[in-house]
Amino acid sequence: MEFINSSSNYFLNKSTYINLRWIGIIGQFLTINIVAFIFKFEFNYILSNVIVIFGAVSNVFLINYNRSTQLSNKIAFYYLLADILQLSLLLYLTGGILNPFSVFLIIPSVFASSNLNIKTNLILILITILSISVLTLYHQELPSPLNDYKLSNYYYYSIPLGLIIALIFLNYFAILFGK
């Protein structure tokens, strides 16, 4: 892909990125299992945990694959794309855009905006917007005690709209003031 070719000017600090991913993976694992076993909400927690394990395996691979202290623009793109897809799958299984953790979907592209080139970041923004749109229309039920909640369409569609506005706003300012 021409857009994501490596550049010596754009990179991610590998150790910072790995540590942030471990925080996310541990948080996902704890949240899934607390909701499943303590709150006893019904959802596909086995598949959800498999998706989190995929994230952990990719992080171990990242630690051992690249001995450099920096991730090139291209390598960082693929890992951030994997993060967006992993979180999108988790959100699909757990309520889609109605899941309160859906706000975390914008983090990979915001993180990239101050570290990677503009073309790579635009691709990540578009993929994130696509993910938000798909999760608005297609998802499993939001786990809840009685699985009984009603939202007006105004509120329901304001969530993805707010996420997309936040994504664009935060990326704009991170690109403008990030480096």
Predicted regions and their residues:
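Short, amphipathic, aromatic/basic-enriched membrane-interface segments that mark the entry/exit
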Residues: 12-20, 68-78, 90-98
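Short, Lys/Arg-rich, polar N-terminal cytosolic tail immediately upstream
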Residues: 1-12
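Short, charged amphipathic alpha-helical "coupling" segments at sensory-output junctions
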Residues: 9, 177-179
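Canonical alpha-helical transmembrane segments
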Residues: 55-70
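Alpha-helical transmembrane segments
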Residues: 19-29, 78-86
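Alpha-helical transmembrane segments and their interfaces in multipass membrane proteins
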Residues: 14, 26, 30-52, 68-76, ...
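Alpha-helical transmembrane segments of integral membrane proteins
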Residues: 76-92, 96-138
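Membrane-embedded alpha-helical segments of multi-pass membrane proteins
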Residues: 52-57, 81-85, 100-108, 157-165
